[in-house]
């Protein structure tokens, strides 16, 4: 038997207020069609599909009236690829991603990001679109104390897309992979996911160690593989321990060690190369591998 949903349940799924759904039903005729005896009308599978399409079209820039008309007149759900190809302005992409994150629409976010990365590359997508969305989400949480789940959801969706991009490398130009890690107890790893994906576009292969990488893991990888470059990320000051680059084992040829993240500061890091942005990190690593 088909599960029927209340207006509150559908509102949660779409990331809108129940009052908004009632307005859409009243103004545009896009609402619940199923009815259980002795209860309010409830939303069935087809109703939810139409509302999901309407929500995505609104996120993509359509007016609610146009989106409702399109959703009601289309027999099958429009492919996401067609919806996300309609953007020409970067600010529209930022707004769409932000709204899709609020709506927790994973498929829309992934499709839009894949399309954007295919058009502009990881570095431009990161700097022009993704970072602004993260800033918007972060500011909203700081101001209201709500929405921390949106940041986590969006970050994990981003990581999936970046891992997908990084896995597409087939013929790396570097026989010895670059080493990439978030050091110590550093839980933040989104930036190094972006870096690994951006390097993959240049056919530069990485050994990705991820978050909370202990020194022993770095030490073992350096001794085994003698990487041409090592990128160490620290978002927080308490995780930016200089021993992570000072005590690395000596290997030949010596690797290019780069530091990323706002955690690295002070005189201990003065002689190290710090990377101000993703593009700079990619260029430095490309030089280190001889690209």
Language-model segments: which ranges?
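A detector for short, charged/polar N-terminal pre-domain segments
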Residues: 1-5
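Short Gly/charged-rich anion-binding patches and loops
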Residues: 6, 19-20, 52, 194, ...
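Hydrophobic adenine-recognition pocket in adenosine-nucleotide-binding enzymes
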Residues: 10
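Long amphipathic alpha-helical segments
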Residues: 13, 18-170
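C-terminal regulatory/effector modules of DNA-binding transcriptional regulators
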Residues: 145-291
